[in-house]
């Protein structure tokens, strides 16, 4: 009866024939399942972007490894900075540098594990995962930038003799030269990790593009 009703409806049979034969004007994105409800198939642009996302997985993994290594070096240098009573905990900004890099290390470990699993399985990341990753990348980049700026300001003050009471002339007279070198190197690696995190964040924007504009 449903077939007769469809054929008897004005233009019903023609529309169905046009869709089945691929006639001009028929929508190629509409698919009619057995239930009779229309579903939207992904556009070619959407599929192309998602394919590129899968191809970038190896590059994204490389960035995560770089972020991990750089942050490990940064917090290791800061933790080992100790000379004539000068340690990282003496300066609040240096403690912040160490804490942020430790957080980034744990975050990148999780991202490395997820990236490897996605590469092995060949699957496309879920939308919710992409949104969470983008947010965490933004937060991590902000924290790394803030930590690097705070550490650099303290290093500049020490180099200019701003802590003369406790440590002579700071890094100038050699009393805490080793401490200064370790701390400054830690700040430099923090900025390098920040730049890598920014690139990861930009890749996150591209990964979200199919869900936002297509």
From Swiss-Prot:
Subunit and interaction comment: Homodimer and heterodimers.
Compartment(s) where it occurs, according to its Swiss-Prot or TrEMBL record: Cell membrane
Start and end residues of each stretch annotated as Disordered: 1-20
Name of the protein: CASP-like protein UU5
Segments traversing the membrane: 58-78, 100-120, 139-159, 194-214
Extracellular-side positions: 79-99, 160-193
Pfam families: CASP_dom
Family as reported in the entry's similarity comment: Belongs to the Casparian strip membrane proteins (CASP) family.
Membrane topology (UniProt): Multi-pass membrane protein
Parts of the chain on the Cytoplasmic side: 1-57, 121-138
InterPro entries for the chain: CASP_dom
Main localization (coarse): membrane
GO cellular-component term (any): plasma membrane
Keywords: Cell membrane, Membrane, Transmembrane, Transmembrane helix
């Amino acid at each position: 009866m449903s077939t007769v009703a469809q054929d008897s409806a004005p233009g019903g049979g023609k529309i169905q024939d046009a869709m089945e034969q691929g006639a001009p004007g028929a929508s190629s994105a509409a698919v009619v399942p057995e239930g009779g409800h229309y579903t939207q198939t992904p556009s070619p642009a959407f599929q192309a972007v998602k394919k590129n996302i899968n191809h970038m997985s190896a590059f994204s993994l490389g960035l995560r490894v770089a972020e991990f290594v750089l942050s490990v070096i940064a917090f290791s240098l800061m933790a080992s900075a100790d000379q004539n009573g000068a340690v990282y905990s003496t300066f609040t900004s240096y403690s912040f540098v160490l804490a942020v890099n430790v957080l980034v290390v744990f975050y990148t470990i999780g991202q490395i594990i997820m990236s490897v699993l996605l590469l092995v399985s060949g699957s496309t990341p879920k939308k919710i995962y992409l949104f969470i990753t983008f947010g965490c990348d933004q937060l991590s980049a902000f924290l790394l930038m803030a930590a690097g700026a705070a550490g650099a300001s303290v290093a500049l003050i020490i180099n200019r003799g701003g802590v003369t009471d406790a440590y002579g002339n700071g890094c100038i007279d050699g009393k805490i030269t080793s401490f200064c070198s370790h701390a400054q190197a830690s700040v430099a690696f923090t900025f390098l990790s920040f730049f890598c995190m920014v690139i990861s964040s930009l890749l996150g924007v591209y990964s979200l593009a199919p869900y936002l504009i297509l």
